[in-house]
A protein has these predicted regions:
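Mature catalytic core of soluble alpha/beta enzymes
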Residues: 1-307
Length: 307
């Protein structure tokens, strides 16, 4: 049976779902309907999203939210509060100050950065599981789930497809890959996933890995950036300084069972020294990593050759 695919522009990127199934057209339509529902829930750049209602009510009142949104904020908050974590879901005011990745991107002024840094504090996010409410204690705070939403959404689509009996699929959310089973359209071989060469245009790979029932998530400074007066500013920010994080890395890829875990650990670890990243990954069950530094050197965690 051939591979059936459908692509749409959602969540600020091109999303493609490919699967092998007699009901492909119907399943693809339902998968994208689910993604549109999740985008409405999690979008930090839409005035109409459920997430934005929380941000509008910052410093005013708690907001009751859908269980999916509560779950994702809870997960994001847990990892934002973890020691030495570079993940911070309260980073919204800083993202909106720089706007890197948007048409109105600019280099933020020091005064602007200093004015929003006090708002980037995940300790000011208060959750009440008994009422499913979220409250931002300081006016001007903004939650941004951009570092987690694609992974969480990919997992939701995979869960739906598995419940429908799909045994061969590839979900590609703008380079965040999640696979179900093997590629039945190509002799039931593992899916072959390329690891992007950060120094070259998309589609140029430094290596290819075989993947079965795994997620492959890459975060890199090459993805979205702004160049002003010869200086390059990427989109991965340091919550402490308000500026793009200083790093030796060009990209960090995490291979995991769940896509949201790939999002969590690429974000938590980006900004650490490569040796520290590999040391931490070795202690995480079910997590592997591929690091590419700015010189193009590649290093991998111990489980990569056995994938």
């Amino acid at each position: 049976m051939p591979l059936s695919s459908h692509s749409e522009r959602l969540m600020g990127t091109t999303i493609t779902i490919s699967l092998v199934d007699e009901r492909a057209d119907s399943l693809l339509q339902k998968s994208f309907d689910l993604l549109k529902e999740l985008e409405y829930r999690f979008n930090a750049n839409s005035q109409e999203s459920e997430l934005m209602e929380i941000n509008y009510q910052a410093g005013i009142a708690p907001v009751k939210v859908h269980p999916d949104l509560f779950e994702l904020i809870s997960l994001g908050l847990e990892h934002s509060l973890a020691p030495s974590s570079h993940l911070n879901i309260s980073i919204g005011p800083l993202i909106q100050t720089w706007r890197i990745g948007f048409s109105d991107a600019k280099v933020a002024q020091l005064q602007e950065i200093e004015s929003v840094l006090p708002l980037i504090n995940p300790h000011y996010i208060k959750l009440d599981s008994s009422t499913s409410t979220v409250f931002l204690k300081q006016k001007g705070m903004k939650i941004d789930l951009g570092c987690l939403a694609k992974g969480y959404s990919a997992d939701k689509v995979a869960q739906f497809l598995r419940e429908e009996g799909v045994t061969s699929a590839l979900i590609n959310l703008g380079g965040n890959i999640l696979t179900i089973g093997k590629n039945q359209a190509r002799g039931n071989q593992p899916w072959q996933i390329g690891i992007q060469d950060p120094a070259n245009p998309r589609g140029n790979h430094l290596m290819t890995i075989p993947v079965v029932n795994k997620s492959v998530v890459t975060s890199g400074i090459y993805e979205r950036h702004l160049t002003v007066d010869g200086k390059d500013y990427h989109h991965i920010f340091d919550s402490q300084t308000g500026y793009p994080v200083e790093t030796e890395l060009a990209s960090l890829t995490i291979i995991s069972d769940k896509s949201v875990d790939g999002e969590i650990w690429t974000t938590r670890l980006f900004g650490e020294r490569p040796a520290s990243i590999l040391w931490q990954v070795e202690s995480l069950e079910g997590i592997e990593a591929i690091l590419i530094d700015k010189e193009g050197h590649l290093s991998c965690s111990s489980g990569i050759p056995t994938l």
